[in-house]
Structures are given as C-alpha cells and as structure tokens.
Amino acid sequence: MSATSTIDPAEVAKFEAMAAEWWNPHGKFKPLHQMNPCRLDYITEQIAAEFDRDLSAPLPFQGLRLLDIGCGGGLLSEPMARLGADVVGADAAPRNIPVARLHAEQSGLTIDYRNTTAEDLAAAGERFDVVLNMEVVEHVADPLAYLTACRELLKPGGLMVCSTLNRNPKSFAMAIVGAEWIMRWLPKGTHDWSKFITPDELYDLIRKAGLDPVDRKGMVFNPVSWSWSLSDRDLSVNYVTASVRPR
C-alpha cells in the first residue's frame, strides 16, 4: 500500500513531458546542466566535511548510501556514483526512469533507479547516509510532510542537501519572467512562484521536520560568463542548504 504522498500530479506531468530532454545540454534542461557544476561543488564539499572524506581519493564516497530524490535523468546520481557512492535515484515521473537507466548503462555505471516517492521509500524502511533533495521542494504539495519523509530516510547523523528558489520580486523576474518568458530556457509554467520558499521559511520547515540546519549558500548566475558560483551572502534567487539528522 502506498504511503500518503506529497506528490503534486500536475508538477509531475510537467517533467514527464520533458523526459527525453534530460541529457541534452542545449535543451529544456539547459539551466540545470549549467548549474550542475556549482551544485556538485556544494554537495561534495558538504558530504566530505560531514563524513570526513578525502576528495582527492579515487572513490571518496565509497561505503556511503545516497538517495537522489527527484533524480530526473540522473544529472546528480551519475557523478555521485562515479565518486563511489551506492546510489538510489528516485523519481515520481515514470518516464524519467528508463531515460536515467539507459544513460547510466551507456556510461558504465550501476545506479538503482526507481519510480517511487520519498514517502513510499520511508514507509518501506529504506535508510541512507545522504539524501539529495535538489530543486524538488518547490514542486510538492506539502513541503513539511515531504521534508519529514526525507528526515525519516536519513540514518542518525545523516546529511540532507536541499536546494530551491527564494520567493521575492527578483526571483520572479529571473526565474519566471527571464528564464521562462523571455529566454525560454524552460517551458512556461515550469515553476509556480507562489511555491517558492524563502531561506528562513525553509530553515523553519527543516527544523520542524526534525533536522538541524548546518549551512546555506546562494547559487548565483553570472550572465557574462554564463556560469554559476556559490555565495555566502547572495541567497536572493537560487540557494542550497545542508542539514543533519541528530544522532
């Protein structure tokens, strides 16, 4: 029996319609491809710090079980597998899973991709050292229930990395007007600005879910270099957080 779900069917349908585009760096997921190096820098730094891993080692994350929730086509799952993690990629959109499986197979990677939800994984007793929760929380129907399921998925002392979009006039101008309406990097309607979450709101939700926030940084786009970088101060549009489940 399926656990109570926070999945928003309309949000899932948006990403199902774009499933074949995941590994096209010039397609509908171009913004994620551009952002990915910045996301990976933050994720790897946080995992290395939390679990005392040497990133110069051949497989620094060997022995860590990692869940990439809302994995899409595997843009984060694959780099984590290359670093040695035992990766489960989960997505509520059924069409994303065969795309992710095929690309992993072509890349010579072993990744356990599943069409499932955080709630169902938690109900099944699955537990992980790391949960990646990237650009998902703004698409769910009940953020607190969803984050609570993510906490249940973590082993004591486990790490959750969560990224999302701030809610303010600047984020509307850049993420909605700029990215969807003008530049057409994403189809119109990909994001619902009213579902964006401020950093303080997210910290409050994370604490209510039973996790301890330990870090947050902005992810800032430079339109001149067309690259992303981490910022300690600018969380005005995209930002990322790290939280741990108490031991």
Curated annotation (Swiss-Prot):
Residues bound to S-adenosyl-L-methionine: 39, 70, 91, 134
Keyword field contains Transcription regulation: no
Protein's UniProt keywords contain Coiled coil: no
Reactions catalysed, as given in the entry: a 3-demethylubiquinol + S-adenosyl-L-methionine = a ubiquinol + S-adenosyl-L-homocysteine + H(+); a 3-(all-trans-polyprenyl)benzene-1,2-diol + S-adenosyl-L-methionine = a 2-methoxy-6-(all-trans-polyprenyl)phenol + S-adenosyl-L-homocysteine + H(+)
Keywords: Methyltransferase, S-adenosyl-L-methionine, Transferase, Ubiquinone biosynthesis
Protein family: Belongs to the methyltransferase superfamily. UbiG/COQ3 family.
Protein name as it appears in the record: Ubiquinone biosynthesis O-methyltransferase
Species per Swiss-Prot/TrEMBL record: Cereibacter sphaeroides (strain ATCC 17025 / ATH 2.4.3) (Rhodobacter sphaeroides)
